[in-house]
Amino acid sequence: MKEVTLNNGVKMPQLGYGVYQVEPAEAKRCVSDALAVGYRMVDTAQAYANEEGVGQAVKESGIPRSEVFIVSKIWISNFGYERAKQSIDDSLRRLQTEYIDLMLLHQPFCDYYGAYRALEEAYREGKLRAIGVSNFQPNHFIDLASNVEIVPAVNQVETHVFCQQRRAQQYMNEFGTLTMSWGPLAEGRNGFFTNAELIAIGQNHNKSAAQVALRYLTQRDVIIIPKSVNRDRMEQNFNIYDFELTPEEMARIEALDLGKSLFFDHNDPETVKMFMGWR
């Protein structure tokens, strides 16, 4: 398993298992399967309502806690210093762990400065091994990173072959912040799994379109967390380090970039209004 080094020296797997939209009742089974396949990083969030299942699976796996990298996120209803501080303790309890390896702020809305101060404090106390943000576009990210004491280790943003975030990644690199992809398979949108270019490149390596797309991101030094509730698909998503895309193949995939989200634009006022309704 390839590891990446965060800006505070902490190492984390480049490939992990995501549990977005995994039902709480299914989370334990899915994470147990993922750990059995070989995954050693699990990405959850307060808003997913499945932290308990993740914690149970890790605890009952028999794998030392130090060998499983847990990522979670604070939801905007818990932003502000005091609420974020309490929510970190709540996540620790639900995950049945004394520390969380990486804790992120889930969205760039509400009092994220107050919430980030709570992250910094919990980091210094040893409750969090690393801290970061999620869905922060370059304007939000640069503003925050320039005005906090601990620069985010990671920014988790929509990143896949149709929304490649190359410019955003350059800005984050200037701060030593790594890009982490949510939706690395774009939830199958825009004909993802039947894309002729991805299929053709996959045939060169006896790999699927999904495996090619995931490998493309890892070769660009992006952290990925593909999600599947099917163990066979978990295994396919895991087996992406036994081949290398050529520079020519990388360029062909780069040309697939649409330069826009397939989900929502965090700079769109209507998107902000939507999230305000989820507080």
Language model feature labels by segment:
Residues S77-Y116, E120-E121:
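Glycine/small-residue-rich loop that forms an oxyanion/phosphate-binding "nest" at active or ligand-binding sites
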Residues N7, G55-R65, D89-Q96, E121-Y123, ...:
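Acidic (Asp/Glu)-rich catalytic clusters
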Residues M1-V4, E52-K59, I88-D90, P138-F141, ...:
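Alpha-helical scaffolding within the catalytic cores
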Residues M1-V68, L185, G277-R279:
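N-terminal binding-site loop/beta-alpha segment at the start of enzyme catalytic domains
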Residues V22-A25, T44-G53, S77-E82, P108-Y113, ...:
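Acidic-and-aromatic substrate-binding clefts and catalytic sites of carbohydrate-active enzymes
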Residues M41, Y99-L102, A130, V154:
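Residues at the N-termini of beta-strands
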Residues Q107-R279:
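Beta/alpha (TIM)-barrel catalytic core signal, keyed to glycine-rich beta->alpha loops juxtaposed to Asp/Glu
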Residues V22-A34, G80-R94, G114, N139-F141, ...:
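Short, acidic/polar
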